[in-house]
Amino acid sequence: MWSSGIWAPIALFVLTTASIRQQNNVLQPTRSLAQLALQKVLSDASPIFGDYVHSNASNTNTAQWMKRYLDITKLVHMNIPGTHDTSTWNYSQATQDSLNHVTNLDRVSVLPPEYYRCQDRPIIDMLDAGIRVFDLRFAFDATNTTLVFYHSQALQSETATVEDVLFGFYQWLDCHPSEAVLLSFQYEDSTKAYASNNADVQLAMFNILTSDAARKYFVQTKGELGTLGEARGKITLLRRFDLDRLPQSYSDALPGLHFPPALWRDNGLDITLTYNTEKNLTAYIEDYYGLDSPIGSGAALNIQWKYNATTAHLTKAATQYLDSLFWTFASSEYDTDSPPETPEIMALGNGTEYTPLGGVNQRLLLFLQSMKGKRVGIVMFDFYETPSNLVQTLLDI
């Protein structure tokens, strides 16, 4: 016979173990298969979207800045910050080196990463910082089966597909239902030898944008921007690609605004593009990205030229066609200059006495501070986080 004195410690151990297990179950609840699947998708998307974590930043004013606007506010009346070539934030030398084996399959050569890199913060940080418009460039991967992100010949990630990254946006919008996101999708040319926006590419993009998930999260209105209330918790598609290799019914089935590439004048200082001919709805766009000053002009002059083009368009947005869409790109480069001006130099200056005023961003900060009470529309930045109050200044106009 065992004595009660022997059983007591055993009973205590069993009860303590059960209690610990119960506590662990409370602290770490079992995840559903759907949650595990989403976690896997977000992990694959992380080289472009960033690591999805619920941080304190998600509760900041910039993460929920649209809360302060009424539902009846028209999107064309709002000042909305965006990022140009959003997916390039992680394109470091290490990233380029890690992707060389894929780039070699594409049979292209790439320049140093600073020629392609236009951002240095992930999409999740951009969202929390108040960015709401994203410029995304896609093409087929080396296998010609999956849509991924490029900047010219520079593949941005081997694992982060277009569809994966969209799930990052969907998840973020679920956590921020007051916000509206606008995604500009553009087919990227020159990604690899013999690549083209063919029927297979177009069908792949169509399938992504008409999936069950996309139908839930994309605003289904076609051909016009509505109110903030209609767009909250959803994505508005800004379509900078054609489906001309597919029957017309495919284009008819896609929501959002269509900006035909043939009408988007390359390197345009002042583009006028009618995106809805029936209602005569027009977008006014500045996309003067490639400077054409004489070789050797230097960073200071080229920054000044780009600043002049940007502020001229923002002034037009504040004073003309107040019920129309204005879309201004503050981004630029002059990589054929000697020495070259990379996107970072154009945005922030080159850190020498030759650019004492900084780059376009620093100069725009002062300009935006002078535009209090004005509508300037969508403004697309490179390296948006410098100066640190640039985005907040746009939001506070």
What positions do the PLM features span?
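Fungal secretory targeting signals
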Residues: 1-22
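Long, acidic (Asp/Glu-rich), low-complexity accessory segments flanking structured domains
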Residues: 17-129, 142-175, 180, 245, ...
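Conserved, mostly hydrophobic/aromatic
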Residues: 126, 137, 183, 237, ...
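Loop/turn elements at helix/coil->beta-strand transitions in domains of secreted/extracellular proteins
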Residues: 129-132, 177-181, 214, 232-234, ...
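An acidic- and aromatic-residue-enriched active-site/binding cleft used to recognize and process polar
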Residues: 138-141, 185-188, 240-242, 384
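Catalytic cores of phosphodiester-bond-cleaving enzymes
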Residues: 161-215
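Structural alpha-beta junctions
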Residues: 203-222, 267, 317-323, 397
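C-terminal active-site rim and adjoining tail of enzyme catalytic domains
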Residues: 238-240, 244-397
